């Protein structure tokens, strides 16, 4: 799906003109799909660390997923935060060790990058760790305690 979207954007949208017009470093394309409940993939984001177009990011959100429910507002927020560099905290990935994932599971972590609540309001928390990963806060002590990887903003 990524290549189809990336090709469409390259062929039809002048991303450089958008960056210049809005004095932006990056452009985020948010795709919203009106999907059925059956056979719908989970939402995903493809951003800076995983995209060959380092100044373009893609977010895909499927209105219905998981077989049973419509995507709640917290899902939108979670996916948008990916576009700014926040990693998922619910599985092991580069910079997120298993021990930290286990800790989040055992403590009932309410970080929006670990859990997305259902319902009309967002009750998940935007934490200092999230602020660090999206580039608006300092590296919190817990990142060093758990050996979490650097944010995209520290890595550049």
What are the roles of these predicted feature ranges?
Residues 2-93:
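Active-site-proximal segment of zinc-dependent metalloprotease catalytic domains
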